[in-house]
Structure formats: C-alpha cells, structure tokens
From Swiss-Prot:
<dbReference type="InterPro" id="IPR016163">
    <property type="entry name" value="Ald_DH_C"/>
</dbReference>
<protein>
    <recommendedName>
        <fullName>Gamma-glutamyl phosphate reductase</fullName>
        <ecNumber>1.2.1.41</ecNumber>
    </recommendedName>
</protein>
<dbReference type="InterPro" id="IPR016161">
    <property type="entry name" value="Ald_DH/histidinol_DH"/>
</dbReference>
<dbReference type="InterPro" id="IPR015590">
    <property type="entry name" value="Aldehyde_DH_dom"/>
</dbReference>
<dbReference type="GO" id="GO:0004350">
    <property type="term" value="F:glutamate-5-semialdehyde dehydrogenase activity"/>
</dbReference>
<comment type="function">
    <text>Catalyzes the NADPH-dependent reduction of L-glutamate 5-phosphate into L-glutamate 5-semialdehyde and phosphate. The product spontaneously undergoes cyclization to form 1-pyrroline-5-carboxylate.</text>
</comment>
<dbReference type="GO" id="GO:0055129">
    <property type="term" value="P:L-proline biosynthetic process"/>
</dbReference>
<dbReference type="InterPro" id="IPR012134">
    <property type="entry name" value="Glu-5-SA_DH"/>
</dbReference>
<keyword id="KW-0521">NADP</keyword>
<dbReference type="GO" id="GO:0050661">
    <property type="term" value="F:NADP binding"/>
</dbReference>
<dbReference type="InterPro" id="IPR020593">
    <property type="entry name" value="G-glutamylP_reductase_CS"/>
</dbReference>
<comment type="pathway">
    <text>Amino-acid biosynthesis; L-proline biosynthesis; L-glutamate 5-semialdehyde from L-glutamate: step 2/2.</text>
</comment>
<keyword id="KW-0641">Proline biosynthesis</keyword>
<dbReference type="InterPro" id="IPR000965">
    <property type="entry name" value="GPR_dom"/>
</dbReference>
<dbReference type="Pfam" id="PF00171">
    <property type="entry name" value="Aldedh"/>
</dbReference>
<keyword id="KW-0560">Oxidoreductase</keyword>
<keyword id="KW-0963">Cytoplasm</keyword>
Length: 421
C-alpha cells in the first residue's frame, strides 16, 4: 500500500477512535459489561470461523520457519479461545473505575474539592504474535472507557482481524460504537510509524513485545508510551536471610517460567552466607538445567559455574541462565541494582526489618519485594484482575498496569456561589 494511502487509512482510524472515545466516556458500566459478555459468547459461538482464520496465519508462519514457541503463542486452540472468553467475563466482573471520586476536601470558603477518575481517551496498542492480546487489550480499554486502535504482529493478521469483528459485534450488541475498538488491517510497518506520531488522535501508546520493538517505538514515537524495555530482575539474599526461604525464593524466582519479564536474571548473595547457601542452591539449579555465570568469588564456591562478564549483569536472558554475584553488604547490593537493573522488579530475602525497609526505600524499581520471588510481577497477582502490561516509567502508570492505569484524574469542585475576592 502506498505511503499516502496508509497515512489516510491511519488518520481515518484515529478520527473514528477519537469520536468513539467521547461516546465511551459516557458509557454506563452496565453497557460496557453487556458488551464484554456479548464478546465472550460470540468467541465461543464463532470458534470455527476464528480457527479457520488462525489456520491461515499458522500455515504462513510454518512456511516462514517461525520458532515453535512463537507458533504455540499464535495458535487459537479451543482451550485458548475458552481462556479468552473467560478473561472477558472476569474483566466484566471487575469494579468500574470510571466516575469514582477521591474523598473531597472542604475549603474554608465552603467549596468542596475532589478528583474524579476518567478515561485516558484513545489508546494505541502495538504487539507481536499473540492474538489473545487483541481480546485482552480490547477488554481492558473498553472497561476503562477508552477507545483503542490495535496493531498486532504480521504473523497474526488474519486472526486479529477476525477477533476484531467479534469485538465490534459485541460493542454493537450493547449499543456502543463499533469504532471504539479498531484493528489495523495492514502488515505494513509504515502503519506503526504513523500511529505513534498521531498526537492529535492518540493519547498514549502501549507496546507489548520484545526489546527491539519497544526501543524502536521509544526512539520514534511522538505519542507518550507506557512501556518497559526489559526485566533484568534481581534477588538479593541478605546476611540475615532465613536459609530455607532464601533457597525456595531464589529457585522459584528463576525456574517458575524463564520467559516472563519477572524472572530473576541475577542472584546477589551476601558474602556472610554465600558458603552456606550457594552450594545447595547451585546443585538445585544444575539439576533443573540452569547454567550459572558467576563472579570470581562465586566460582570459588561453585567451580562448575561459568565466569561472568559485565554483559551478564546487564542481560535479560529469558532462558535457563542465571548470573550470580557475591556482595559484601546491603549497600553493595543496592549499588549493583542501581547500575545494572532495569527498574522492573527486585527482591530482598531477609529477617532484618531495617534492611528490608531500606531496600524497599532505596531500590528504584517499579516493584520491590521482601521475602517474595520476583515472578509475582503480574497484575492478577497484585489483585488488579488483569493487566495491559508492566511499566517502568516514572510518570503516570508504574508497575503492572490494570484498569486504573488506563485512566487519569480530573479535579471536580462544587460550590454554592462563592466568588474569589
């Protein structure tokens, strides 16, 4: 498609979304829930159509040599469709954040001042090969009163377009504008380039994908992003750690799932407990197929480990590889995380309350844990019900981004004729 045609098509999507966002701002909670329930029913009723569209994507992906793990994410099995439908119903059951107000403050002149939660407006979602994100993102944006433009990966185009039709049918069943959720129907990368610069139509972009995609968007976007580049997460075993807690937390933080952004990538161990804790932990990791890359002091205790380089401290492996460093103090652990961490999720294992409080205060990450594995970095685990992603931004949303993260606050004041003298 010529660049001028893509620009025209994207601008039309943006104009439609902006118009729909005004209607969504007025939508009742009952109407939004009706739409979500209708979508869930339509997913189950139209699974044959969905799977036929998905088969086109799978055939093309196989022919193109897509990795098996990515092929699995692409597949809309019966189980995957049922999961998406259940997810829609779960979002429908969540409290509606729109219109809620903070406690009001009574000013000396008698006026009341409060804040009201309102939608962000129009959200662009850019993601890679998982078609379930089409449903997840549509559900959260709809429930939070936003319009959204969805641009999925080229591998899932047919699946995403088919899912988009189901979402729009659900919106229409609830008398809501179909344009509140629109799927970009081209694989041309120029569409992404246009989307991330349409400041007059798009209020925020949420990218879901690999580091390369997000880095590109961060460098080129004119629209604000809610994002994280990577999840280089740390667990620090303090001198005052309970040995059994340290073992189970560190092991779970790494082995729960290697490919999630909350997986531990570097283990920091206080020198005072390294000799007593590391050998058993290293044996458990070895038995689980995890390769250890250690500092010189780690190699003295775990000779089977590979020597670590500075690149290892900076790497999000998303694989059964773990960097291990022995540190002399809490100060050194905090300094290491400040230098090499990504601001995602970091944890301390300790029975020392003052050390725990200091770690949580001084480690500048979006989530900081005491005596918990980093793999809890997930909106569902936080009680958010669902999440659009995890943000390491300092402005607006930080950490797992649920419904409230897709809203903002406006000031609302009530008076009785007061004037300013």
């Amino acid at each position: 498609m010529p660049a001028t045609d893509i620009d025209t098509a994207m601008l039309a999507l943006g104009e439609n979304a902006r118009r729909a966002s005004r209607a969504m701002m007025r939508a009742t909670g009952a109407a939004k829930n009706h739409a979500l329930q209708a979508m869930a029913e339509a997913l189950r009723d139209n699974r044959a159509e969905l799977q036929a569209a998905n088969a086109q994507d799978i055939d093309a992906a196989r022919a193109g040599g897509l990795e098996p793990a990515l092929l699995d994410r692409l597949t809309l099995s019966d189980k995957a469709i049922d999961r998406m439908a259940e997810g829609l119903l779960q979002v429908a059951a969540l409290p509606d954040p729109i219109g809620s107000t903070t406690a009001s403050a009574l000013r000396p002149n008698g006026m009341r001042v409060a804040q009201m939660r309102v939608p962000l407006g129009v959200i662009g979602i850019i993601y890679e090969s998982r078609p379930n994100v089409t449903i997840d993102a549509a559900a959260l944006c709809l429930k939070s009163g936003n319009a959204t433009i969805l641009r999925g990966g080229s591998e899932a185009l047919h699946s995403n377009v088919a899912l988009g039709r189901i979402v729009q049918a659900g919106l229409q069943a609830a008398a809501l504008p179909a344009e509140a959720v629109q799927v970009v129907g081209t694989t041309d990368r120029a569409a992404v380039g246009k989307l991330i610069t349409m400041t007059e139509h798009i209020d925020v972009i949420v990218p879901r994908g690999g580091k390369g995609l997000i880095a590109r968007l961060a460098s080129e976007a004119r629209v604000p992003l809610i994002k994280h580049l990577d999840g280089n997460c740390h667990v620090y075993i303090d001198a005052a750690a309970d040995p059994q807690k340290a073992h189970t937390i560190a092991f779970n933080a790494k082995t729960y799932r290697y490919g999630i952004c909350g997986a531990m990538e570097t283990l920091l161990v206080d020198a005072g407990v390294a000799v007593s804790i590391l050998p058993r932990l290293a044996a458990a990791f070895s038995a689980h197929g995890v390769e250890l890359r250690g500092c010189p002091r780690t190699l003295e205790i775990v000779p089977s480990a590979t020597p670590a380089t500075d690149d290892d401290w900076a790497t999000e492996y998303l694989a059964p590889i773990l960097a291990v460093r022995i540190v002399d103090s809490l100060d050194q652990a905090i300094e290491h995380i400040a230098r090499w961490g990504s601001g995602h999720t970091d944890a301390i294992v300790t029975e020392d309350l003052s050390a725990a409080q200091r770690f949580q205060r001084e480690v500048d990450s979006s989530s900081v844990y005491v005596n918990l594995p980093t793999c809890f970095a997930d909106g569902f685990e936080y009680g958010l019900g669902a999440e659009i992603g995890i943000s390491t931004n300092r402005l607006h949303a930080r950490g797992p981004v649920g419904l409230e993260g897709l809203t903002t606050l406006k000031w609302v004041l009530n008076g009785d004729g007061q004037t300013r003298g």
